[in-house]
Amino acid sequence: MDPRHVVSQLLSGQGTEILPQGDHESLIVAEQAIGEGHTQLIDDIMPNLNEIESHIIAYRYALLGNDAESAQQSLNTALSISRSKEKRDHLLEARIRMEWGILRASLGEFEQAGVDIKWAVERISALSAGHRWHGMALLNMATWHLNRGELGMALAMHAEISRHGPHLVEIVSTSRRQAAEILIGKNHLFSALRNLWIAHHGFRQSNMEEAAVEAGLHWIDIGLTEVSSDAPEMNTAIESAVPRSAGDPKPRVWIHPNDLKMMYEWLESRTDDSGAISVLEDAHRALQS
C-alpha cells in the first residue's frame, strides 16, 4: 500500500471505500495526508480509525500547532489505551514509544529519547520486521546516534536496513541517502557514491523524483573527482563491496563514464536549478573529454 497514491485518489474525489483495510493502514494514510498538508481529508478518514489511532492524529495536530503540552497529553492517552486489557495493541504501543522518543529529543530529554526509540526498534522488529514503522524507528535511532556524534553507531543502524528487504524501498533509499552524508563527513567518498547510487535508484522506483534528482546530482558532484573507463561500474562496485579492515587504504574515488552518461541523461530534463545546471555542465564536459 502506497499512502501517497491513496491520498491522491482521495483528493481526486474517490470515496473512503478505497481506504485500505489492513491493520493501521488508514492511520498511515491519515498521517500522509497531514504530512502533505491535506488536512481537509482527515474528517473523512477518522471514522476508519480506532480510539488509539485517533489520539495519534490528535498528537499530529498538536505538533502542527507547536503545542507540546497537548502533544504529550495525546501520546499519554494513546499509550495508556494501547496497554489496556480491553484494547491492547503491541504494535501501536511500540509506534507511540517511538513518537515519545522523537518528542523527548525535541524537548532536550536526549537520554530518555534514546531509551524510547531503542525500545520501539526492538519491539517492532519482533512484531513485524520490515514494517514501515520498523524502518522509521531505525532511521530515528540512527539520527539519535548521529546527534550524539556517534557516527559508527548511526551507520550500524542504517546497516540494519538491508537493500535486499524486507524494508520498503523508500525506507532503504532514505537510509542510504542519510548514510551517504555520514560517509562524506568521514571522507569515505567511494562508499558514499555507492550509497547515493542506491538511494537515487530507489527514489526513482518509489516515484520520489525530487529526492532522486538531489541524490543523483550529489553522486555526479562527487564522482567527477575522476571519470575513467577503467573504473568499475557502480552496480558491480555495490555487489562486490566488502567491509574494510583497519588500516586498509580508502578506495579510489572514481566513476565509469557509462554510469555518468546514464545519470546525466536522466537528470538533464528534470532540473533547472542554477547549481544543478552547473554540475550537469561539468558532467557533460567530462563525457566529451
Indicate residue ranges for each PLM-predicted region.
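C-terminal non-catalytic interaction modules
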Residues: 1-25, 216, 223-289
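Residue at a conserved register position within TPR or TPR-like alpha-solenoid repeats
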Residues: 33, 62, 97, 104, ...
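Residue register of alpha-helical TPR repeats
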Residues: 24, 53-56, 93-95, 134-136, ...
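Amphipathic alpha-helical segments of tetratricopeptide repeats
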Residues: 43, 47, 76-84, 118-126, ...
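Residue signature of alpha-solenoid helical repeat architecture, marking inter-repeat boundaries
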Residues: 20, 49, 91, 132, ...
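Structural register within alpha-helical repeat arrays
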Residues: 29, 58, 93, 100, ...
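Structural motif corresponding to the intra-repeat A-B loop/turn of tetratricopeptide repeats
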Residues: 36, 65, 107, 148, ...
